[in-house]
């Protein structure tokens, strides 16, 4: 939103709260998007150049019916509907093109299933009713103000001179996108005429192993990393989980790999992301200004690491 305001756009946020802390230049609409009648009431008589649908309810999920409901309501009121999907919409697999099949309706993981179903619903609205839909599929997003304990997880431990847990053999692939590059490509998705009706993979062109990721975090902080490889089955057996409470590799960070190819976004949207190292350098500056100085409970990691450290 800050970027849209900076570019001179009139910006409105629609959410459940009666107010916000985004500044006086951002107007406020209060509604629960799950309540169609509320949406109808607050959107009545209003038109927008573009809608950015970025919200996902991690507690209850955001089903395709909710996304489709908003799309139907604004179909004749907007010239662009930009939906934030995810690399997870593919379900699994490596080196995906945009034309690859998305996760089916019976996919077991809710987030991936709902993102895939939402994309299918929006493109049906585009085909049948002319909704000017564009979808974006980013991988792991990193950068300042990340609400997930990810980059900070590693930097906290590196600064405390902790040994890091490396799940498995360290070769699991991860792919990233700096948040400022995501913002820039969202603006492009709003303005480029040829984007309508298309999905775009957006991320750094090269995937990285988890070993390389740890090395990059250490380099950004100017620290040396010490790691111990621990089999995933042992991590899970003693209570570790990617979503916590017993984290071992950041929040929701150690996941089966899904990677994508970004040639289409480069060609159509002029997508030019910064390197992972460049983005981490800026993110670390933010971290130094904002990180919490409270003590961290390392007892679970100590439990994981103890056998390996005793054997070494």
Regions found by a protein language model. Give the residues of each.
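N-terminal Rossmann NAD(P)H-binding glycine-rich loop of SDR-like oxidoreductase domains
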Residues: 1-9
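Conserved SDR Rossmann-fold cofactor-binding beta-strand/turn motif
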Residues: 137-138
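Substrate-positioning beta->alpha
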Residues: 148-154, 167-190, 197-198, 212, ...
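Mid/C-terminal beta-alpha module of Rossmann-like enzyme folds, strongest
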Residues: 188-250, 282-284, 291-293, 297-312
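Conserved Rossmann-fold NAD(P)-dependent oxidoreductase catalytic core, especially the SDR/UDP-sugar
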Residues: 68-116, 124-128, 134
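Residues in the short beta-alpha loop(s) of Rossmann-like NAD(P)-binding domains
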Residues: 17, 87, 206
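NAD(P)H-binding glycine-rich loop region in Rossmannoid oxidoreductase-like domains
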Residues: 20-23, 27-77, 90
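Glycine-rich Rossmann NAD(P)(H)-binding loop
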Residues: 143, 167-172, 200-207, 218, ...
């Amino acid at each position: 939103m800050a970027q849209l305001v900076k570019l001179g756009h009139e910006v409105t946020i629609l959410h459940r709260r009666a107010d916000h802390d985004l500044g006086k230049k951002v107007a406020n609409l209060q509604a629960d998007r799950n309540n169609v009648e509320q949406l109808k009431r607050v959107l009545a008589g209003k038109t927008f150049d573009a809608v950015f649908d970025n919200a996902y309810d991690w507690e209850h999920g955001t089903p395709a019916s909710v996304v489709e409901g908003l799309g139907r309501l604004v179909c004749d009121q907007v010239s662009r509907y930009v939906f934030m999907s995810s690399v997870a919409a593919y379900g699994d697999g490596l080196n995906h093109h945009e034309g690859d099949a998305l996760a089916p309706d019976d996919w077991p993981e809710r987030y991936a299933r709902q993102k895939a179903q939402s994309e299918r619903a929006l493109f049906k609205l585009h085909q049948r009713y002319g909704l000017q839909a564009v979808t974006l599929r980013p991988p792991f997003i990193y950068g300042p103000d990340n609400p997930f304990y990810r980059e900070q997880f590693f930097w906290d431990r590196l600064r405390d001179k902790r040994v890091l847990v490396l799940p498995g053999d360290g070769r699991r692939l991860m792919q990233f996108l700096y948040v400022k590059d995501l913002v820039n490509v969202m603006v492009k998705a709003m303005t480029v005429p040829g984007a309508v009706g298309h999905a775009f993979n957006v991320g750094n062109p090269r995937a990285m192993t988890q070993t390389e990721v740890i090395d990059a975090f250490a380099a950004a902080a100017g620290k040396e990393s010490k790691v111990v490889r621990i089999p995933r089955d042992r991590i899970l057996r003693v209570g570790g989980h990617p979503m916590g409470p017993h984290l071992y590799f950041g929040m929701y960070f150690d996941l089966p790999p899904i990677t994508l190819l970004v040639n289409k976004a480069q060609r159509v949207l002029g997508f030019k992301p910064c390197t992972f190292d460049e983005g981490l350098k800026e993110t670390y500056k933010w971290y130094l200004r904002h990180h919490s100085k409270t003590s961290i409970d390392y007892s679970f990691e100590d439990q994981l690491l103890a056998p390996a450290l005793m054997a070494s």
